Structure formats: C-alpha cells, structure tokens
Amino acid sequence: MAAKVTNNPTPESIVKLFNWVVNNRHLGWDIYDGLNSPLLRDIKSHYLRVLILQANKYCPINMRPFLKIEKGLDLKGMALFTQAYASLYSTTGDERYLTEMQNAVKFIKEKSLKEKCGYDCWASHYYPYTGIDRSTLSLETPDIIGTSQAIIALIESYKITKNAVEKEVASSAIEYLVNELFIDDVEIPFFKYTGSNEDPKLITLNASAQALEAISAFQKLEYRSDLQPICEKAAQTLLHTQRDDGSW
C-alpha cells in the first residue's frame, strides 16, 4: 500500500523556501568548505589547513566569493531535501514536491559508492575536509552520516513510489552499516564514523545515533530479527554514555 496522500495547502513560508531552494538548484556552501578554494587547495601544512577551515567558518564576512569557493550539491543535504519533499507531497498532494523528491533520489542513487565498496554507501562531503585530529574526509570516503540519511531518504521515497530499487538500495546500505561500521567485540559496542578508520580511539556518539535511526526506519519497513540486537546494543551505548545532566 502506498503512503496516504492528503491535499492540505502549503503554508506560504514553505512555498517561498521551496521556490528559493529550487531556483538555486539545491546548491549551497558549507561551513567547512574553506579548502575548496582553488587558491588554497594545494596547502600541505596540517595546522594551516585547519586554520583556514576555522577562519572560513567563523569569519563574520562571507569570504567565499573572494576565495572563488563554488557552491556544491551536498549528499546529506539532498537526502534531507528528499525527506522534506516526501513529507510535503504526502501532506499536500502537490506534484511539484513529488517531482523534486524523485530528482533528489536519482542524485542519491547516482552518488552511491557501491562499485568501490561493495555496498551502497555515501560520502557526505563534496569537498576535502581536515579535522583538528588530522582525520580527513573526501568524496570517496563513505561515512555514517551521509549513508544513514540516504537510507532514511530512500525509505521515505519508497513509501510513496513503491519503487523496489529504492528499497533494495536502502537494504544494501543497511548491510554496509552493519558489516563495515559496527564494532561489536568491545565493552561498549558502537558504529564507526567511517569504514576507513580501522582502529578508532574515540566513539563518535552521533554516528551510533544516526545508524540506529536509519536501521530503525528500515525495521519499520521490513523487520529483520538479526538487526534487532544491533539496535538494542546501539541504544544501550547511548544510554550508557549519557551524562547525569541529560547531555552527551
């Protein structure tokens, strides 16, 4: 059964935002895109690269036009747009939202790194990123955030279109999370941020939370008994690491 579609009017503020997003072709800057400047891209010093990223992030003036940093299509952003369009179409029945949702899903499927990794998975970033801890991310480094959001996007689209390919791709990505990112043989089981990090020294808690959200969404679509204990372990990790004041 397809998702129920109603015909409620869209608030004017959402229509304005939708038009702005479409007119800008979903392109945007990112707060960590400083190294995407052709003027700065070849800098090798780790500390200087981090300084550039942070200066670009916190500068009160948008320096990107002067640094010739171009806007890009962000995978995670497109996954979130897909989820928003699915919700808007289900609420309003407006075919424009359905069209944009399908275009966004097409982009997601095209950006899959399955040929490289063996599973459908995605890199969040469209630009090189260097962390203070010397960690790096690239267009060819699949990560848990982009992959989890893509899974949720594909599931939300599948609920409307019943396109079996979307369900198959989501299922493949679930296998990537479980087989490549889940660390179970430790005192506190967790999901790694990237598969390339063979021996993570720290647990990135939002990585486990994102994976739990994606797997739970898939479980609602098609329950798998083998995923249940993984969800429970990830949930226990989040509960175990919560501070007394409720924060993480």
PLM region spans:
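Glycan-recognition and catalytic cores of secretory/periplasmic carbohydrate-active enzymes
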Residues: 1-248
